[in-house]
């Protein structure tokens, strides 16, 4: 049986491996580090003495690729969220609190209810989102949503920046339309916010590795790809050159490179790919005890300060700041002080931060999702017949999210299966 070689065991690579293994194909997965998951993983932090996620990820029940992936690997019950959609917000400038509550049906009755929408907004304000349907690749988020409008700072900007990890006045609006269409556009049933109950590895990584291992797929850690060798006619790859040796490819073998854009650019010389990236800063605080149930909202959007979103899991409070280029340049102590100041107000806690805190900076979290970057997103198929590409930065039509990463892996697998490679 032909072998499919998948290089990169992040979410995209795992998605490809799971899809191909599910279809009964023989796969080998290579990962340069000693763990799978890439930017989507959990680890034990010695400072906090707790398992924490490398980054916080908010998912929606309408993320179909995520849900299908979790179902295949047996982790469909590993996410948690409200029974009905509810998005809590806190405004640091006015100290107002509110909760956006979409109704379950497709028609958005909720925008006609003052108690279910953003304070100061009217039902007609939400119709701005329809303009996303006609957004061109050059259209910015701020071209669609008026920055001076009542919804921008309190709803559209937090949503856009968290999804695109790019400032709203630089971000490509076109990427938001499929996100809204597949979630909020289908009604509240598909827009329930979900987070990993225990951690990202427990939901997305460990069950996938178990599934692959039980199915006979091979996984090699510490395998760093240096280069690839092409056949004499240049139409196919003939070998993968790893630091510890070469892997010769059989005539019917295929390869999926599920690597970050900068890494892939070093291996496939001359291939265009997005070069500009934006960081994400996550800060984790360990409390002396879990919050009281009244205050223990799983997550909350924060506007008017440094923090974008905060997440609560047992005695750990985690915050995320997207497109955090300026914040990422600050010292650990400055970041802790700035983010805790927001948390203390949002959750009504003391002004002094807990002694146990951990700052995690992901300096190249995603590519800058700007109009200039969109044409540089790679297609699944390449000039080499037996080479496919995957990764959240490839041209999925979606932003660089977990949903996009899983779809990219599935697309690479589908390309192989449909060609009977």
PLM region spans:
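Helical element adjacent to the flavin cofactor pocket in flavoenzyme catalytic cores
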Residues: 179-244
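Conserved Rossmann-like nucleotide-cofactor binding loop
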Residues: 12, 35, 262
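Glycine-rich active-site loop/strand segments that organize a redox cofactor
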Residues: 38-62, 128-130
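Conserved flavin/dinucleotide-binding core of flavoenzymes
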Residues: 101-103, 309-421
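Mobile amphipathic helical/loop "lid" adjacent to a hydrophobic cofactor/ligand pocket
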Residues: 63-181, 190
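Mid-domain catalytic core of redox enzymes
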Residues: 223-350, 377-381
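Glycine-rich FAD pyrophosphate-binding loop
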Residues: 21-46
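N-terminal Rossmann-like FAD-binding beta1-loop-alpha1 element of flavoenzymes
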Residues: 2-29
């Amino acid at each position: 049986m032909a072998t499919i070689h998948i290089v990169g065991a992040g979410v995209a690579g795992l998605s490809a491996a799971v899809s191909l293994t599910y279809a009964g194909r023989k796969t080998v997965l290579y990962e340069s580090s000693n763990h799978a998951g890439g930017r989507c993983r959990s680890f034990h932090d010695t400072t906090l003495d707790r398992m924490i996620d490398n980054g916080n990820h908010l998912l929606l029940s309408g993320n179909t690729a995520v849900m299908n992936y979790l179902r295949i690997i047996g982790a469909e019950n590993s996410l948690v969220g409200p029974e009905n959609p509810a998005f809590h917000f806190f405004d640091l400038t006015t100290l107002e609190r509110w909760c956006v509550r979409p109704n379950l049906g497709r028609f958005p009755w909720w925008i006609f209810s003052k108690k279910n929408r953003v304070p100061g907004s009217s039902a007609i304000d939400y119709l701005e989102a329809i303009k996303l349907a006609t957004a061109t690749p050059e259209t910015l988020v701020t071209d669609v949503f008026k920055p001076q409008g009542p919804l921008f700072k309190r709803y559209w900007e937090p949503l856009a920046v968290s999804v695109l990890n790019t400032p709203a006045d630089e971000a490509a609006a076109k990427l938001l339309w499929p996100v809204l269409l597949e979630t909020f556009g289908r009604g509240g049933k598909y827009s329930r916010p979900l987070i990993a109950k225990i951690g990202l590895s427990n939901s997305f990584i460990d069950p996938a590795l178990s599934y692959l291992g039980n199915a006979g797929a091979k996984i090699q850690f510490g395998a760093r790809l240096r280069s690839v060798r092409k056949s004499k006619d240049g139409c196919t790859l003939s070998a993968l050159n790893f630091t510890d040796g070469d892997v010769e490819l059989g005539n019917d073998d295929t390869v999926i490179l599920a690597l970050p854009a900068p890494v892939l650019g070093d291996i496939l010389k001359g291939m265009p790919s997005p070069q500009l990236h934006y960081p994400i800063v996550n800060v984790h605080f360990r409390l002396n005890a879990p919050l009281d149930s009244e205050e223990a909202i799983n997550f909350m959007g924060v506007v008017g300060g440094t923090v974008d979103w905060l997440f609560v899991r047992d005695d750990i409070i985690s915050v995320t700041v997207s497109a955090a280029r300026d914040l990422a340049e600050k010292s650990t102590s400055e970041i802790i002080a700035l983010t805790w100041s927001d948390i203390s107000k949002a959750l009504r806690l003391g002004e002094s931060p807990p002694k146990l805190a951990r700052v995690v900076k992901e300096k190249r979290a995603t590519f800058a999702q700007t109009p200039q970057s969109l044409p540089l997103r790679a297609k699944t198929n390449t000039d080499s017949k037996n080479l496919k590409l995957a990764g959240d930065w490839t041209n999925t039509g979606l932003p660089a999210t977990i949903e996009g990463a899983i779809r990219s892996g599935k697309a690479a697998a589908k390309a192989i299966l449909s060609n009977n490679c």
